[in-house]
Amino acid sequence: MKTTATKGVQAILIIIFSVIIASLFGALHNQFSYSVSSEFFTNFLFGNFGTNEWNLKNERLEASIVGIIGSYWVGLILGIIYVIIFLFMKTENNLKNIKNAILINIGFSILGSLIAYLIAKFFVDYKNSGIFMEFGTQNPQNYLEAAFMNTGSYFGGIAGIVAGIIYLLKKKQKLKIKRTSHNS
């Protein structure tokens, strides 16, 4: 049986891990989005996040910073959700299972972004998209694709938390079956 102090340290580690993974995802994801449309960042996200006032000389660095700012809080929320599950779930390799659930969550965010990008690329014309763009945007279709990628990653994250919880429930169920068969 783990002590309360050990559980508390592990809970903090889960939150830290979740925030770091989400931040890394945001920084890397924005590098791909920036490659699709730098205008989405210069015309929208940099102003939206206020980084355009920081006088950064490297737009790619700025895109990564925006990614971190836009995703660390999601990692914090997910970390708290997974800590609650961690504290009440009694399974073997509990910490490992939580880590895997967080990685599943990020995988779904990546998948959501990719699916949204493909939908924008092949099925949505920017003229009928309803996406607000600055007047004079040079590559509006690319802008739309980057905007869809951004939104898709959040929808993927929502699906990912569901998938992560299902994963944890299945792990718990397997342990319950395993314990029942050993007691028989």
Name these PLM-found stretches.
Residues 2-3, 77-105, 168-184:
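Cytoplasmic juxtamembrane regions at transmembrane-helix boundaries
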